[in-house]
């Protein structure tokens, strides 16, 4: 399903264009590898998010995570052969019309940014969607547990805060795991994407 290609291309582009030192980049890559292992170890937690009768998934993110939201919704759409409706947007843009996509069969995932200012938009939409009490589940995907949010959260704890480009990789692994598990859930084989 080309998940490895996406991840490798993203990592290579990030490493090429990032102006940080080689040593700093190496430390960040080592950290994202550990975070990736953590996603695999916590697969059941992700499976628990999907243990409900949903038929829609929305991914939201701010800054670089807006593009990550697009890739994430594309992967679930592809691996489910369109059996699950998907949408994506930025955290700020979602409330201006696209939020009408949410119904009581919708899972909403929000990639929470580490930037303090940008993070406010992510938290605002998490709380707004949760407060609407329409979505089946609203799930924050985040690196630390500073999020004040009443919904569910897949949180990477105990790591140094990463820049967006690097944090996108463990975040996308969460989304790829959602896509894989959903593919099996709808009776599709992940090796034959549409």
PLM-predicted stretches and their roles:
Residues 1-194:
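A SIS-like phosphosugar-recognition module
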């Amino acid at each position: 399903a080309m998940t490895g290609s996406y991840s490798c291309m993203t990592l290579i582009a990030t490493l090429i264009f990032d102006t940080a030192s080689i040593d700093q980049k190496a430390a960040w890559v080592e950290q994202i590898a550990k975070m990736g292992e953590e996603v695999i170890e916590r697969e059941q937690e992700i499976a628990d998010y999907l243990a409900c009768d949903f038929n829609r998934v929305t991914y939201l993110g701010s800054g670089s995570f807006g593009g990550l939201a697009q890739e994430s919704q594309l992967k679930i759409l592809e691996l489910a052969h369109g059996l699950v409706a998907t949408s994506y947007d930025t955290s700020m843009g979602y409330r201006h019309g696209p939020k009408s996509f949410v119904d009581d069969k919708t899972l909403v995932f929000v990639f929470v940014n580490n930037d303090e200012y940008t993070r406010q938009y992510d938290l605002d939409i998490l709380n707004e969607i949760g407060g609407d009490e329409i979505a089946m589940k609203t799930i924050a995907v985040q690196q630390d547990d500073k999020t004040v949010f009443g919904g569910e959260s897949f949180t990477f704890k105990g790591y140094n805060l990463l820049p967006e480009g690097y944090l996108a990789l463990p975040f996308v692994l969460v989304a790829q795991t959602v896509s894989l598990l959903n593919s099996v859930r709808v009776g599709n084989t992940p090796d034959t994407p549409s």
